[in-house]
Regions:
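Acidic/glycine-enriched connector segments
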Residues: 2-108, 112-123
Length: 125
């Protein structure tokens, strides 16, 4: 269950964030713009990285490294993999970590990935 999640942060002016943001809001999540402020970076206690075959944009890789150094729990979803497995593992991640402030990151090219639609349809947490 994800009732412990207070805020899901999404990057401003990101095609990936725009494509997933409405779906998160419709599911009752509070979303906020991630502006990389020190306050937000301190508050984030979970990161979900969406990718294809472990390919990350430079900016996404830099943010991943920043949160790795801060030892923030991170979960990766490979959009080229099986969505049922990805959704199951995401549920387990949230159940285990109980994070309250989560950052969702994804490369711009993922907005056109057909599996992103499957993810949005089947994510019933």
């Amino acid at each position: 269950m994800t009732s412990h999640i207070k805020v899901i942060y999404l990057e401003d002016k990101s095609a990936f964030a725009a494509s997933i943001g409405n779906s998160l809001t419709e599911r009752g999540f509070t979303t906020e713009v991630f502006n990389e402020s020190a306050e937000q970076i301190e508050a984030i206690d979970g990161v979900v990285l969406f990718h294809e075959n472990h390919n990350f944009d430079r900016h996404i890789a830099e943010l991943r490294d920043l949160f790795d150094k801060r030892q923030v729990a991170t979960h990766k979803i490979d959009m080229s993999g099986t969505m049922n497995v990805a959704l199951s593992h995401l549920s387990l991640f949230f159940d285990r970590i109980k994070c309250k402030n989560v950052l969702f990151l994804g490369s711009e090219n993922l907005k056109d990935n057909p599996k992103l639609e499957i993810f949005k349809e089947k994510w019933h947490l």
